[in-house]
Amino acid sequence: MTSTTPEIEALAADIGEQIAIDVAKWNLFLAEAHLHIPLAERVYPLLEKDELGRAGVEAALKDLSVAIGGGKVNISLLDALSSTMVNRLLTLLEEYQSKNF
């Protein structure tokens, strides 16, 4: 997707405020890392098509690269999130889907 819709922006805001990368026992929320909109753009089609599930969400997280050290190292967002955060993301998406679709 090249442009964000109000629906994706609303989902991105929820993701950005609630989902964080754990960096040396410090929470870097996805909004602060500027990863909330790209993630929302990847998972929103799953919600639209009623295909939300762990495998699809993990595939979206794995597809999103996080640059570390000025781009010297790249890891997937799936690897950067704790299992707790992945579960929280799934719950957030399920709740969003039940309210909006």
UniProtKB/Swiss-Prot annotation:
| One of the Pfam families matching this protein, by short name | DUF3181
Q: Which UniProt keywords apply?
A: Membrane, Thylakoid
Location in or out of the cell: Cellular thylakoid membrane
Q: How does it sit in the membrane?
A: Peripheral membrane protein
Per the record, its GO cellular-component terms are:
plasma membrane-derived thylakoid membrane
Q: What is this protein called?
A: Thylakoid-associated protein slr0729
**What organism is the protein native to?**
Synechocystis sp. (strain ATCC 27184 / PCC 6803 / Kazusa)
